[in-house]
Amino acid sequence: TPEGARDYLVPSRVHPGCFYALPQSPQLYKQLLMCSGFDRYIQIAKCYRDEDLRADRQPEFTQVDMELSFVDVDDILDVNERLIKKVFKEILDVDVQIPLQRMKYAEAMTRFGSDKPDVRFGMELHDITEIVKDTEFVVFKNAIEAGGSVRAINAEGCGHYPRKQIDSLVEFVKTYKAKGLAWIVVNDDGSLKSQIAKFFTPEKLQEIVSALDGKPGDLILICADKDKVVFDSLGALRCEIAKRQNLTKPGDFRFLW
């Protein structure tokens, strides 16, 4: 069946003008075995996909491919968890505690803005739509009236960022279709600085900061748009800030279903 990636096409030496494709995901053996009555099939297979190289993509990769008959979700998760535990112990000498943490899709999107959240650090999303619903600030007002939301993250300890660095974060979220970011800096003396201060009373700004447990030295970043745009933008932004602030360690593994 057609898949998202392109096949690697190899010219046939024996049949001029004909080609064969390297496997994107081996199917034939699996289908034959399952049709023959085998109750389960697990294969470690080399796969090839003609796609651009990215952090989570490469042309050649090794895939654990499995088909199990008469099982439910918990059976599948159990097989994979025991496999992960064994591999990480034997290869990296890392003890993985099972069962692994599970999180529903809606919770992952609401808290982290991603269906594959990095839970090694906080900086969770907070919905502040109710707090700002009566605002006359056009960006927030239009987003709410269109059925969207206003959400924010607290980049703890980033209040020292110069304006140029904050602007780079604004440009970053624009690649995820966000129109921009509003921001509030909590100064060391507890006072607040923001480019949207003229649209809100000091009490309302403080209410926003308090909702995110903001403290002196923190940077509150706010995005208003359709939910998908807000989730995509803030979900990617929290990971970008974590990378800049070195909030994650290479050997720290946090598995999540």
Language model feature labels by segment:
Residues 1-257:
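Class II aminoacyl-tRNA synthetase catalytic cores and aaRS-like
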